[in-house]
């Protein structure tokens, strides 16, 4: 039977208490960012837990460390605030046996709190570019050998602790599609996550829109990115009203992000120029 391995990106861990907190019942790797550099192992309930502690920073870098140490057949991407349901491992392996052509499957996760409303999978369906940006990394299980064959890793420019605050999961999925991997949704809940608060979301502010522009440029090019920015605003105009910014101001900020991405210019060095103008500074 294929082996499932959970890859957890975490910080500041001193022990293996996350095994119980996350209800893990499979092999697991904790990529732990801290001030130390060390390697630990623990056997539990017939499974093996590994903890790789490094002084690196950035969620993409952390996930890549977990990928480097992984030896499972199916890899389940995770954050340390996820709690898995009983039988998640069996459910995931069963799903791959039912959809053998899939290189990766995207599952359902129950969200506790109102910060994020996750799109719910209702059927087994192929993921394409048009719907690829609807899913986060912690819903993804993927065949390790496919990632190796396609040389796919997480970006180190997007996500917590990097230049741009979010988007590493979107780029991971996009990269899989670009390199010909077959991704499907699967309508089974495998976990729940409390997202009453967020480690990176600080509201629909100038930096949010600047980083969105940079993400769309990273995924495509500056011309398609501008189109994606406009359609994003049109689809989410009710949400974006919370920003207090006009349509033109938001587009200008996104365009700054598109321009800044060419030289990996962060918001603090580029986007704030618009913010100052908006505030009359």
Tell what function each PLM region has:
Residues 1-29, 40:
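N-proximal low-complexity "stem/linker" segments adjacent to membrane-targeting elements
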Residues 54-70:
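Glycine-rich, basic loop-to-helix element that forms the pyrophosphate-binding segment
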Residues 75:
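Short aromatic/hydrophobic "clamp" motif used to bind/position activated sugar donors
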Residues 87-120:
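Conserved donor NDP-sugar-binding/catalytic core segment of glycosyltransferases
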Residues 116-148:
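Short, flexible, basic/aromatic active-site loop/helix in glycosyltransferases
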Residues 154, 180-192, 204-205, 227:
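Catalytic beta-strand/loop signature of glycosyltransferases that borders the donor
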Residues 159-171:
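Acidic donor-binding loop at a coil-to-helix junction in glycosyltransferase catalytic cores
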Residues 203-213, 218, 222-281:
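Non-catalytic, C-terminal membrane-associated alpha-helical segments of glycosyltransferases
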């Amino acid at each position: 039977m294929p082996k499932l391995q959970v890859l957890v990106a975490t910080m500041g861990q001193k022990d293996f208490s996350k095994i119980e907190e996350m209800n893990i019942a499979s092999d697991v790797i904790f990529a732990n960012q801290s001030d130390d550099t060390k390697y630990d192992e623990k056997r539990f309930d017939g499974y093996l837990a590994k903890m790789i502690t490094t002084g690196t920073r950035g969620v993409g870098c952390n996930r890549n460390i977990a990928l480097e140490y992984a030896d499972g057949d199916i890899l389940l991407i995770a954050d340390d605030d996820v709690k898995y349901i009983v039988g998640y491992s069996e459910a995931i392996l069963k799903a791959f046996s039912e959809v053998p052509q899939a290189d990766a499957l995207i599952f359902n996760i129950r969200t506790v709190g109102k910060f994020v409303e996750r799109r719910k999978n209702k059927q087994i369906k192929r993921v394409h570019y048009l719907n690829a940006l609807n899913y986060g990394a912690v819903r993804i299980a993927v065949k390790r050998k496919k990632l190796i064959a396609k040389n796919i890793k997480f970006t180190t420019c997007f996500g917590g602790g990097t230049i741009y605050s979010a988007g590493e999961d979107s780029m991971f999925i996009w990269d899989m599609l670009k390199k010909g991997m077959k991704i499907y949704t699967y309508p089974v809940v495998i976990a729940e996550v409390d997202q009453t608060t967020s480690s990176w979301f600080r509201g629909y502010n100038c930096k949010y829109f600047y980083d969105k522009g940079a993400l769309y440029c990273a995924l495509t090019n500056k011309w398609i990115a501008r189109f994606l920015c406009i359609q994003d605003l049109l689809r989410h105009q009710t949400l974006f009203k919370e920003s207090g910014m006009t349509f033109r101001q938001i587009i200008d900020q996104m365009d700054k992000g598109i321009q800044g991405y060419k030289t990996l210019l962060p918001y603090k060095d580029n986007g704030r120029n618009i913010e100052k103008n908006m505030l009359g500074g």
